[in-house]
């Protein structure tokens, strides 16, 4: 067989081998993605999402629909967070809905920055935290943390205390519910410090460090 023909066949054999290898790699990637336990949990909650990529986020997802019946949005950017936080928000949706809330506005989710006054990266840097500030519903109207949250209420026996306004009561009940649900590692409010005067900071642990996936706590309202 002429050497030119042998060379041509050799190139074809190499291309076939490369195609076969590419198919194997794609198959492995697809099976790995399908087996991801966090996104499986997210899909099981009927959340619309798509895979995303952000520096620092271990399992980034972009949320494209409601979370547990609640739309979570910002004015100028999409909600891209770690899947672990997305599952918590979806699971917590029923607590918002029980209080008449169907829309939540956030001011910050994924953001590369340090904890105020330190050199330690904030959990926002990993997509594991979100700051929510406005809550709306068809009967509720619009509630804002900086305007309607009543500080200094409740104690270790009675978390809610005695709010003076309906808006204050809704926000305090929501805070207590989110704390007692166990779905969030941290829930910080204006009672924590002045830096949180206008929002609730909700933070979770990475998926592999979480002891529970669901909350069995009943909604209080």
Where on the chain are the PLM-derived regions?
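Sec-dependent signal peptide recognition
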Residues: 18-24
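Active-site acidic/histidine clusters and adjacent loop/turn architecture
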Residues: 36-107, 111
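Catalytic cores and adjacent binding grooves of peptidoglycan-active enzymes
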Residues: 39, 49-64, 121, 126-221
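Conserved short secondary-structure elements within globular domains
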Residues: 94-121, 173-189
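N-terminal signal peptide c-region/cleavage motif recognized by signal peptidases
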Residues: 30-32
């Amino acid at each position: 067989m002429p050497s030119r023909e042998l060379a041509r066949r050799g190139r074809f054999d190499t291309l076939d081998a490369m195609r076969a290898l590419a198919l194997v790699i794609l198959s492995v990637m697809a099976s790995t993605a399908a087996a991801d336990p966090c996104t499986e949990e997210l899909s099981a909650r009927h959340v619309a999402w798509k895979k995303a990529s952000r520096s620092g986020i271990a399992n980034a997802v972009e949320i494209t629909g409601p979370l547990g019946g609640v739309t979570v949005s910002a004015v100028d950017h999409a909600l891209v967070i770690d899947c672990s936080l997305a599952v918590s928000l979806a699971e917590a949706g029923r607590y918002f809905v029980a209080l008449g809330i169907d829309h939540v506005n956030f001011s910050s989710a994924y953001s590369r920055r340090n904890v105020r006054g330190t050199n330690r990266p904030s959990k926002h840097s990993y997509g594991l935290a979100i700051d929510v500030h406005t809550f709306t519903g068809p009967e509720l109207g619009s509630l804002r943390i900086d305007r309607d949250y009543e500080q200094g209420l409740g104690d270790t026996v009675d978390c809610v205390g005695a709010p003076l306004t309906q808006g204050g009561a809704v926000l305090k009940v929501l805070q207590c519910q989110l704390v007692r649900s166990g779905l969030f590692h941290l829930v910080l409010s204006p009672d924590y410090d002045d830096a949180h005067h206008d929002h609730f900071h909700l933070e979770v642990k990475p998926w592999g460090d979480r002891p529970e996936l669901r909350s069995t706590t009943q909604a209080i309202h």
